[in-house]
Amino acid sequence: MLAHGSNDYGVSLKGNKTGSSPSKASSLNWNEPHTLNEQNTYCYCGKDRNLRFPDLQCSVCLNMFHLSCLSPPCTSMMGFSTNYQFVCKHCTEDGFERFERGVSAWKAITATAMANLVVKRYVETNPDVPVDSFNAEKMRNFQANTYFFKKKEDLIPFIEEHWQLLCPDREKVQTWQATLGSCLVANRDTYRAKDETMRNQNSEYALNNPNLFDFRSGYIFPFQRVGATVPKKRLVETETPPPSSSKLKEDYKDSKREMKRSNTPWSNASIKKNEVPTVPIRYKPPPWRDSDFETVPKLPIFYPNSSSPNFFSLSEIPFNRRGFRYSPCEAAKDLPNVMYREIELPPFTSRINWHDISTPVFIDHSALCATVEKGFRMARSNVFMTSGEWYFEIKIEKGGGDDGAHVRIGVSRREAPLDAPVGYDAYSYGLRDLGGQKVHMSRPRNFMDSFGTGDIIGLHISLPKPSFAQHTTLPSCHDRIPIRYKGQLYFEQPDYVPSKMMDELMIPSKHNRYIDLPYIPGSFIKVYKNGSYMGTAFENLLDFNPPNSINSNHYSFDDGSLGYYPSISMYGGGIARFQFGPQFSHRPLVLGSNVRPVSERYNEQIAEDVLCDILDEIDYAEDPNTSSVTIDVPQEPNAGITIIPEIKDITE
């Protein structure tokens, strides 16, 4: 039996690629459900349907298409599936197919499994029947409802073997076999028992409909998109259960939550005393499931961009959004208290973070280059800088010309919005291709000549380590909540959000000219264009350390992600490419060996994450109710009256 879209029998169904356009399909004589026609002509190839070659139905023209004829051939779906939405290339404006898997309802899973078992049994009992005999022309009167199957002996082994093809969005919970049995008993409209007077979970069942060619999108269960498995905001009260919409709610019902609180509050000009807790509640992680150790991490699904063939949009992963961020993780048996740890996906290097892009952004397979069709959108790297001397380059592959394509490049903090350009607010510093202006808080200021297509901009970032941090531990918390999203494990963490005070800095006001705002003394961003020094664009960068960053649950601490991220933003087809090193196009000779390529941060961050996991494991094993976080931190001595030039220019 053919379990998915690959051609296991060495028989090609492909023919003339112009075989069945919508206009030709509409001229054929179709049956009522639009699954069979008298001419036996389907798909791009114009060939007949065949029970041993899975196909799917276009939701627009309603023609049927072989999985092996798609571009590229689809190998991720079981034959006779019904939980999908497909649009053929003849019915899309850009000529690219659209395919999306939906929610896997047990009623549909069971029917799909049973249909495949029918074909499998027929092949086993008739091994000498040629493949062509399975064509719709010869199998229209095939009685699939005469084949009976048992739950334990037939359905359970088949579903177990083909779980990822049948229901990739589902976890294999302990009760799934009982759910399968209940589904068979309850759905008389779809399954019939061999003896209806003894209908129970141990009965033999067959499909009610004898025609396997009726299987199509929505046939068993209406198509429903797979939604996020987590709420937009988590509750943090100690006795409040998690939101009912959480897919993991059953794992939390009996979990005790442990508090990690401070005794000494922080003080800051922008934060009132005792207003912002420095350490959040610790949630006990949900228990492992057997399937957690069998799940193979997957990359995002890449969909080609019609206007830029080398760029792709991403799907099948959660994207960072205001107040929440995501990273792939796995169950860790060697960490029985921490229980879950973050993992890396290829390419294993400094690159654009799959999750940390605005959804309209298109990226290439190297994950170093990005573009967008409309509006300014941002993409952030998966590495960030906290202290030290760093250098990276950005190549402008398209921008700064008269065609409307533009880029803005620079660095940003976690709070900076992804649906805005670099330099939009107080959380990012950017350079504008048009006019070569530097931009902070959306206020452009003259800095250098324009740059555009072919230019390479080098950025030297200096973030001196504050003297007070050498003998003081900043508030930190590494706790993360695992969630399940489309069959994969991810950490969900409250991300840092803009404060009201920082947002108000964007409004021109004489009162904002001088403000009590912490910064990093001696920090700067120096700029090079094609290896030539352009000057220092920014000095005394705003401090990102607690309490200057507060997450969406109103806590002020470092979760291991605070720092400045290399960032690119594109507009109207602009294209920018990161060059993180160690090999650069125009590394200035004046930079000493102490200025490191940003590529070195990748392995450093992994080591930092592993170290935090080990320390947390030791800490929680000794006493799960004790926090290892040190809170008593003096106020940064250099945080005080800061003259913000962007505001000074407006008010004078």
Curated annotation (Swiss-Prot):
Location(s) in or outside the cell: Nucleus
Keyword Acetylation: no
Family, similarity comment: Belongs to the cclA family.
Gene Ontology MF annotations: transcription cis-regulatory region binding; zinc ion binding
Protein's organism: Schizosaccharomyces pombe (strain 972 / ATCC 24843) (Fission yeast)
Stretches the record annotates as Disordered: 1-32, 234-270
Phenotype seen when the gene is deleted: Results in a delay of sporulation and a substantial drop of sporulation efficiency. Causes a reduction of H3K4me2 level in the coding region of spk1, as well as a reduction of the expression of stk1, mei2, mam2 and map3 genes.
Subunit structure: Component of the Set1 complex composed of ash2, sdc1, set1, shg1, spp1, swd1, swd2 and swd3. Component of the Lid2 complex composed of ash2, jmj3, lid2, sdc1 and snt2.
One of the GO biological process terms: transcription initiation-coupled chromatin remodeling
Biased composition, class Polar residues, residue ranges: 15-32
Classification via PROSITE patterns: B302_SPRY, ZF_PHD_1
This protein's name: Set1 complex component ash2
Pfam families: ASH2L-like_WH, PHD_ash2p_like, SPRY
Chain positions recorded as Zn(2+) 2 binding sites: C58, C61, C88, C91
Residue ranges of domain B30.2/SPRY in the record: 330-519
Zinc fingers, PHD-type class: 40-94
Binding, Zn(2+) 1: C43, C45, H66, C69
Gene giving rise to this polypeptide: ash2
Biased composition (Basic and acidic residues): 247-261
Function of the protein: Component of the COMPASS (Set1C) complex that specifically mono-, di- and trimethylates histone H3 to form H3K4me1/2/3, which subsequently plays a role in telomere length maintenance and transcription elongation regulation. Regulates MAPK pathway and sporulation through H3K4 methylation.
One GO cellular component term: chromatin
Keywords, ordered alphabetically: Metal-binding, Nucleus, Zinc, Zinc-finger
